[in-house]
Amino acid sequence: MLRLIVATHNPNKAKEIKDFFKGYPVEVVSMKELGIEEDIEEYGNTIEENALIKARFLRDKVKEGIVISDDTGLFVEYLGGQPGVYSARFAGENATYEENNRKLLKLLEGVPYEKRKAYFKTIIAVIEGEKEVLLEGVLEGHILDHLQGENGFGYDPVFFVDGIGKTLAELSLEEKNKISHRGKALLKLKEYILKRLEEN
């Protein structure tokens, strides 16, 4: 049985990963379940650095099992890759999704659709002992000039998925997970963990 420890205080993220490994000899445990309540300061300049900072923090606390952590950013080409590592706090510390979206739309006001290319990227850092691996999932699209769709969260209502003809907020959770950056990164995590199970 492999033990997978998730560096998150978000119960939804932990549950998502637990569901992902249902039926496999993998025990998924969150920080909360281990009684680790501290907030991890994300001071990295990239989402890769932030994912590693969180995973290393937890690895140093638990010293066993496989530790995973993830970070996600939205990168808009016209804005030189912004909001990127600052996606969650684009409009300021503790900004709401609505405030972040409003700031993004304001910065892109008058910019034609073909110049509004963007991509979401999720990085999952996997640490086992001294071994560190980064897994990546990317989803390409464009930023609309208005909100569209009721589902999802964050930038989902403004992110129009190339090849699907809908925003992420117009997809069901199941549809979103099949194509999303996070879904792609989680599939790579699953491949990695299943390979580890074979080695055991």
Swiss-Prot record:
Annotated Pfam families: Ham1p_like (PF01725)
Cofactor(s) demanded: Mg(2+)
Record-listed substrate binding positions: 8-13, 72, 153-156, 176, 181-182
GO terms classed as biological process: nucleotide metabolic process; purine nucleoside triphosphate catabolic process
GO CC, any one term: cytosol
GO molecular function, one term: ribonucleoside triphosphate phosphatase activity
Ligand binding (Mg(2+)): 41, 71
Catalytic activity: XTP + H2O = XMP + diphosphate + H(+); dITP + H2O = dIMP + diphosphate + H(+); ITP + H2O = IMP + diphosphate + H(+)
Keyword Mitochondrion (UniProt): no
EC nos: 3.6.1.66
Disulfide-linked positions: none
Top-level division of the source organism's lineage: Bacteria
List of catalytic residues: 71 (proton acceptor)
Enzyme class per UniProt: hydrolase
Key words, A-Z: Hydrolase, Magnesium, Metal-binding, Nucleotide metabolism, Nucleotide-binding
Cofactor note: Binds 1 Mg(2+) ion per subunit.
Assembly and binders: Homodimer.
Function: Pyrophosphatase that catalyzes the hydrolysis of nucleoside triphosphates to their monophosphate derivatives, with a high preference for the non-canonical purine nucleotides XTP (xanthosine triphosphate), dITP (deoxyinosine triphosphate) and ITP. Seems to function as a house-cleaning enzyme that removes non-canonical purine nucleotides from the nucleotide pool, thus preventing their incorporation into DNA/RNA and avoiding chromosomal lesions.
Homology family: Belongs to the HAM1 NTPase family.
Name of the protein in its database record: dITP/XTP pyrophosphatase
Native species: Caldanaerobacter subterraneus subsp. tengcongensis (strain DSM 15242 / JCM 11007 / NBRC 100824 / MB4) (Thermoanaerobacter tengcongensis)
